[in-house]
């Protein structure tokens, strides 16, 4: 069984998995697209749901985080979901923990994809409010 919690967390067969090395906006977090308020956290979740489709992600565990969630990189048809989300502009490379997805982030930024075409707050700043 699979449930997508948000843009960077899934529950796979009862195990809560947090994608390592990336950070997506919180579900209640908004971005500004011109004058329009966009729920970019929900957009990230929807993009992930669409990307997974009817597939079952294969996850490579990298240990646990402070919240006892499994940290992992998950793949669908051989493609990293983390890299996909960052490259689409709906997740950020979590530089504090990993430099793995910086190139994907630079690609999204250069091409103004996803949140890079909007005004946004980094999720780690948003959570401090």
Task: Place the predicted regions along the sequence by residue.
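Small beta-barrel nucleic-acid-binding modules, primarily SNase/OB-fold domains
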Residues: 1-129
């Amino acid at each position: 069984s699979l449930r997508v919690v948000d843009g960077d967390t899934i529950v796979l067969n009862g195990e809560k998995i947090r994608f390592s090395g990336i950070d997506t906006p919180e579900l209640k977090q908004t971005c500004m697209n011109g004058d329009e308020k966009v729920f970019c956290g929900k957009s990230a979740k929807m993009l992930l749901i669409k990307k997974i489709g009817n597939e079952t992600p294969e996850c490579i565990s990298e240990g646990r985080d402070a919240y006892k969630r499994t940290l992992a990189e998950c793949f669908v048809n051989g493609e990293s979901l983390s890299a996909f989300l960052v490259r689409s502009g709906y997740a950020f490379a979590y530089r504090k923990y990993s430099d793995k997805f910086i190139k994907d982030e630079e690609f999204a930024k250069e091409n103004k994809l996803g949140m890079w075409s909007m005004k946004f707050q980094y999720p780690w700043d948003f959570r401090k409010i």
